[in-house]
Amino acid sequence: MNKKLLKGKIMNIKRIIVLVLISASSGLLCAQRKTVNMSDRYGILTVTPLDKYTGAASLLKTNGVRSLTDVSYGDGFGGVSQKIHVGITPQGKDLTESYEYNSLGNLQSRTLPVPVLSEGASGNYKQILKSAQEYYGHSNVCSRFAYEASHRSLLLKEFGVGDEWTGKAVSKKYSCNLESIPAQRCKRYLVSAGGELVESDSPYADGSLRGIRSEDEDGNMHWEFYNSENQLVLSRILDGDTFFDTYFVYDEYGNLVFVLPPGYQDHPDLDLYAYIYRYDYLDRLVYKKLPGCSPSYLVYDAVHRLFFSQDGCQRNDSLWSFFVYDVYGRVVVEGECGNSDKHVRTAGETVVLGTLMEGDTGLAYSGYQSSSDLVDPCVYVVNYYDTYDFRTRNGFSAYNFPEGTVSAIGNLTGSILCTHGSSGFIYSADYYDINKRIVKSLSSRVNGGMDTYATEYSFQGSPLSVLHTHTDSSGYSLTERYTYTYDHSSRLTRVSHQYDNNPSVLLLEHAYDELGRLQTDKLDNGIYATDYAYNIRNWLTSIEGSKFSQSLHYTDGLGVPCYNGNISSMTWKSGAGATPRGYKFSYDRLGRLTDAEYGEGPSLSVNTNRFNEQVTGYDKMGNILGLKRYGQTSATGYDVIDDLSLSYAGNRLKKVTDRSTTPAFNNGFEFKDGIDLSTEYEYDENGNLTKDLNKNKTAIQYNCLNLPSRVMFANGNSISYLYDAAGRKLRTVHVLEGDSVITDYCGNVVYENGVPQILLTEVGYVSLTDGQYHYNLKDHQGNNRVVVDEEGAVEEVNDYYAFGGLMQQVPGRASSLISIMARSWIVKVGWAGMIMERGCMMLH
């Protein structure tokens, strides 16, 4: 290769050694690395092409194809002293970060990445400390590491970046177990020959366990103790003199058998608190028990693949889940069967194999025949690989699936998923390009329709466009196309959307800062813009838009400073509201929220305490024992609306008592203490809630995926759910006073009583009745806070309590039948049964 090709790229290059050869016809292997030797430094140049190229030389020419170029400079002792991402920033600058090491080769300092305009050729080694200080506006722009002065070089302290954190570090102390010091005292648990837990009378000998004490920037301490096999034996979190201990107990072969969480130390009940695991003679997990649940059993075939499994609910019905494999070890059939325990125990003597036969025979007429007998099998999943011969089989032929034009050897090509809650099936097929990327995907729908997705990719594999065609059995059809645009560094910049013959809409536009962080979002052809800001540690500090804004404070603001990443205070403005509202937060030593003090105005000193939440106690497992919640009690009054006392059986909520007698104003959100019994909540063998008498839920039924299939209320109302075997929700049926509303979820098309109503988009939805776009404005956790239409009019405002309850909702015009229906449920049933689903209010 001609050395002149690298002139201006890296100075003083003496030679180039090609380490990786790549093919110009393939976009899968898209990086080329070269070792570069220089008179004073050496480095590795990595070029990742973004376009198809004709040869390696074209990647290094300034007029060649688009590519990403990285340079790593060595320090001469095997470490990397500097990494440079050449021209990667939005303004085309080099993003550079530097590293320094001590005399033993340990990382001593790491400078934050900084965008630098190269002097001379891009990719040159740079001195960036001063540039970083100027860019960030902080003098402390280096993470620094301190080590023990010994041959072990154990990390003692890590000082993070940011002037606010000067002198604050995440520190570690290395010690051992000592019986004389309470914080370093360790119980000794053993596993008997019969697999039972035994607490030894003789503790660990002093010094037999290696101990590490960690302390974060706020002084919260955590001990970990390891045995001679480097297995974690004890994890201890300290809250003053109170210890929260989790013990890990191993058998003589090193298998984890018991996990004993903090609650067990005060109430040594294995059934309620312990995680229990058992193994066979080949160290395969055969028994698993979670706290408060019946155990699950696992059975393997002769080549160690899971063949049968059974949870507590299945055991009550004498059922087992089964898995059948092809000759390559791929799962081809899943389902449930009624095999006897005796038959299941002999599974380890055989190799389970599913053979694909001709015709509609075998398990569920799928064509697969199992080598092992299955009693009354009910098939939930069927998978086909390598070819598209399944197209003519039972079920597929009704949908006219096309033949594949590119070899799919080694890939999943088709599948059948049962619909839990009905007798139907979902049929699907995937088609690939030569690089094994899915370029076309077809799937039938619960309403008899079909969805087709066709995807075009860039050279390096990013989607450029997705064409979606949806049909249903009535003849209705819908077509939508997403188009994606990327910048020179392959960052997503624009998302356009068009459905049917309507004009294309610039749905979303991204702008990034020089560090690659999202800086601005623009929705709806740029009409609505949201700006984002971050602190020096890349923690989100601000979301700023005309309809929703939010400020997050960590070490500054009105609350007690938190240096470990907890939010100390938060303010927001929603909809047309001009007055900031917010919370000041307090935490205990375990990082659990204890107080959320509400206020309004810039200093949160107006209308204080109106929507406070206070946790009056936690148990050792982190369950809330008491909660006080304030809210609106009249047109002008605010007071305690919930004063809750919660009791548990292990981790299961057993009873809730509300000592507050003041109801929330205008049927607002609050806990409804609907009954006073010693047990108000009941559960099944798998730990699923089956009764919630406070919410008048007299029965909650579940399918084999442990997903709720039906919720029944005391007044005769009910909600039923339909899922496919992968757990995707397909249908919801609400029965209210004898009237039914059926909601079908056909991909991103939502039907109400057979009529298409909503087309979900990446940033909201389109109401299909009028063709209007609606946009969801989200907070830092992804909650939908404001819904606006395509003209920027506010349709809905949601404000939340600190623990997630809906503090206040201000609806505008009802924008969908889902929203209208949800509000009618709230009026008739109350807030006690409400959840948020797809950004809309739904009952559960």
Give each language-model segment a name.
Residues 176-178, 258-259, 264, 277, ...:
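A motif-centric feature for acidic-aromatic and gly/ser/thr-rich catalytic loops and repeats
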Residues 166-193, 225-226, 233-234, 239-263, ...:
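Carboxylate/His-rich catalytic cores and anion/metal-binding grooves
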Residues 71-72, 99, 145-147, 172, ...:
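A residue-level detector for well-ordered beta-strand positions
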Residues 46-52, 72, 82-89, 109-116, ...:
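Beta-turn initiation residues at beta-strand->coil junctions
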Residues 66-68, 93-95, 141-143, 208, ...:
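Short, small/polar residue-rich loop motifs at catalytic or cofactor-binding pockets
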Residues 181-226, 358-433, 550-563, 569-572, ...:
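Extended repeat-based solenoid scaffolds, especially LRR ectodomains
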Residues 1-36:
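Bacterial Sec-dependent N-terminal signal peptides
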Residues 62-64, 90-97, 110-149, 273-327, ...:
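Aromatic/His-enriched, Gly/Pro-containing loop or helix-boundary segments
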